[in-house]
Amino acid sequence: MEEKRVLIKISDSEWEVMRVIWTLGQANAQQITQILADSMDWKVATVKTLLGRLVKKEALWTEQEGKKFIYHPAVSEMENVRSATENLFSHICAKRVGATIADLVEEATLTQEDIQQIMKQLNKKEPVETIECNCIPGQCECKKQ
């Protein structure tokens, strides 16, 4: 089955499960529980509940192998990360996006390759003269009432 290219809103706990499945390519509930048991202190029942939600949201698809269900990603990790980032930026003033990106770069631990990729994108970027505030009046400093 081909991965979807749409944003599926998932909770922080569901992200943890998806990260395991994206890494492994496919997994059953026991495998996921083993990987997340120490850090999350989850039991199999918790993982199965999260898997059920992810299947319902169409983030995963399943196949049955004997008595076990094997879970496969139905959404791309990179597309979901990109969509989550766009969603984050939609919640802040457009005039703050650049400063927010700069803050993220400042806080992140980066390799030389990471820095080169960021610099490459910045060098290709054409600046605009001004950025218009996209907030409702009263939501930011730009449009104080």
Curated annotation (Swiss-Prot):
InterPro entries, per the entry: BlaI_family, Cu_transp_CopY/TcrY, WH-like_DNA-bd_sf, WH_DNA-bd_sf
Binding residues annotated for Zn(2+), in chain numbering: 133, 135, 140, 142
Gene3D superfamilies: Winged helix-like DNA-binding domain superfamily/Winged helix DNA-binding domain
GO biological process: negative regulation of DNA-templated transcription
Main localisation: cytoplasm
GO molecular function: DNA binding; metal ion binding
GO cellular component, one term: cytoplasm
Location in the cell: Cytoplasm
NCBIfam families in the cross-refs: CopY_TcrY (TIGR02698)
Assembly, per entry: Homodimer. Interacts with CopZ Cu(1+)-bound form via a charge-based interaction.
Similarity annotation: Belongs to the BlaI transcriptional regulatory family.
Job of this protein: Acts as a copper responsive repressor. Binds to DNA in complex with Zn(2+), repressing the transcription of the copYZAB operon. Exchange of the bound zinc by two copper ions delivered by CopZ Cu(1+)-bound form causes release of CopY from the promoter, leading to the transcription of the operon.
Name of the featured protein: Transcriptional repressor CopY
Native source species: Enterococcus hirae (strain ATCC 9790 / DSM 20160 / JCM 8729 / LMG 6399 / NBRC 3181 / NCIMB 6459 / NCDO 1258 / NCTC 12367 / WDCM 00089 / R)
